[in-house]
């Protein structure tokens, strides 16, 4: 009996020592308590320690056992059905669905036709008179000029008026640059135009017209002349029969010429009475100077520099050559002056008629007499005769 008691006490003592070592390591990891007295007061007795302090179960690493795999529960993915209800999968369901579709399509078509019939035949959408057509943007053209395009549309439904065709007919009028036609419910049309702006007079034979920057010839009526006082140079050398693209190119050359002359002085263009654009490589302008006219050849470039050359020497040339009629400024370092041919003396009655060869020789001689060449280059340099 004594041996058993002793053996039990030794076992308990060894267990207590192991537990105390484990508690020492555990207490080192736990942060210190605020007060040691409170800790001793809260410490349980020896019997409670023996009852609660039991050895920890061995870990899987120490025991050599493998950890059981974590089994996840798979979620069931719901199977989505189609947009159609389940009864459409059967034969009679499909027939019913097709019938409903055809019924809806027929109903939509019926509504569209009914609305179209209402819009096409209702008298409230008919153009009753010319007062139902509004015009905007016309200053040179009269309202009657624009309404002449819509003569067949009076009494017609506005939805039957071809707007694109009417706009094209308006733009065929020379003064109309751009036209827009739109419907205004219930029974009106609105016509808006942009008119062309003339930039010069155009002389075609004995008739004088206007022309814009794109080469479009504009008729000049007496009413238009009484309304405006245009102050443009007169252009020659543009035939309305040539293509519009060629006319537009020559008008761009004309505008470039005016811009170059106006860059030096605003009143230079007032001296120009006529501009000949027949040759696109030689702009010929007629200037008024000293009570008579001078024909100047400017070529097709360097207009401002060539005009300054003319303006700086014209007084000297007029003093040296009173019969000066033409000045060719196209060359780089020389100016060609041409004099007016003196009138031929009246032929005597008893004089024999000269032969054609004599007339030709006389004209050539006169031509050589009235031509003067003034060189501006240095004497050691040769003058260049290449025209620009």
UniProtKB/Swiss-Prot annotation:
* Keyword Cell division recorded: yes
Tell me the residue ranges located in the Periplasmic compartment per UniProt.
116-388
Transmembrane spans? 95-115
Q: Write down the membrane topology.
A: Single-pass type II membrane protein
**Which GO BP terms apply?**
cell septum assembly; FtsZ-dependent cytokinesis
Gene3D superfamilies, from UniProt?
Cell division protein FtsQ/DivIB, membrane protein fhac
Q: Where in the cell is it found?
A: Cell inner membrane
Q: Does the keyword Cell inner membrane apply?
A: yes
Q: What is its main location?
A: membrane
Q: Extract one GO cellular component term from the record.
A: cell division site
UniProt cross-references to Pfam families, sorted A to Z: FtsQ_DivIB_C, POTRA_1
Q: Which InterPro entries does the annotation name? A: Cell_div_FtsQ/DivIB_C, FtsQ, FtsQ_C_sf, POTRA, POTRA_FtsQ_type
Q: Which residues form the POTRA domain?
A: 128-196
Role of this protein: Essential cell division protein.
The UniProt family comment states: Belongs to the FtsQ/DivIB family. FtsQ subfamily.
Concerning PANTHER family, the annotation shows:
CELL DIVISION PROTEIN FTSQ
Q: Give the protein name, as stated in the record.
A: Cell division protein FtsQ
The organism named in the record is: Acidobacterium capsulatum (strain ATCC 51196 / DSM 11244 / BCRC 80197 / JCM 7670 / NBRC 15755 / NCIMB 13165 / 161)
